Amino acid sequence: MSTRGQPFHPFNIVKQSAFWAIHLGCLGVYWVGCSWTAITICLALYVIRMFAVTGAYHRYFSHRSYQTSRVFQFLLALLGTTAAQKGPIWWASHHRHHHKHSDTEEDIHPPGIYGLWWAHVGWVLSTQFIEPRSELVKDLCRFPELRVLDKHHIVPPLLLMGALAALGSYLGAHAPELHTSAGQLIVWGFCVSTTLLYHGTFCINSLAHVIGRPRFKTGDDSKNSFILALITLGEGWHNNHHRYPGSERQGFYWWEVDISHYILRGLSLFGLVWDLREPPARIYQEALERQEPQEPPQMPLAA
């Protein structure tokens, strides 16, 4: 792995203060304590918002791998912004740029060139990438509601924090047996959950280009990883994805766990999404042809 310094702009702690505040907020567990209620809400919001990032920001806004209505498109975008990873236009624009230049010097987060730390979180903190690459997402910019959401992306996370505080206060007053409070739900339900969500997502930019095994030749360093697929609801089948980014499913085979795919299939049963794109037959044929041939069994020598 190259250790060559990255030629990007420096960090700006003030402009990224929310990112650091969320991480520091996790220290609040020492003061607010823990309860099964808080842990349950933490994990539930992790899964729900991870789907919003993987199933909406990534598979829909970045790659248009399925279709939906304008209303549900906005709801997906709104849910995605609660993950505190900025708006759908910003997210999709930088991801599309990544696919155009994957693991080259033009890529914004190639771990093999600029290092694992930069690929994981450094680029997110760089002042160079604060604004979206609007020229790459003209299809999204034509929706004024998405532009507004992108501009005011900080509002949904704040509303989520407020809702958690209100819920914690209510449960503390009316269900004391749950042993929770406003502060506890803010710390666990937002700060801890969001921090886990950050680094689960970031692992795809960093570790999914370093660990695992490739099935396809893609011209980059993308890998498939079962562990990363579990913690990101299916994004760990990254080599599959880089071979055919237009596919809604990233686990190409039934044994490749892809929870975001299962959720989208479920939503399609209710008509909320449709035209979910599958990998074509030629992709599966390519995978078969790349399998290492099995050596024929050796016949034992006669005594």
Residue ranges and their predicted role:
Residues 139-144, 213-237, 243-244:
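Active-site-proximal inter-transmembrane loops
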Residues 1-203, 247-303:
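Non-catalytic, topology-defining segments of multipass membrane proteins
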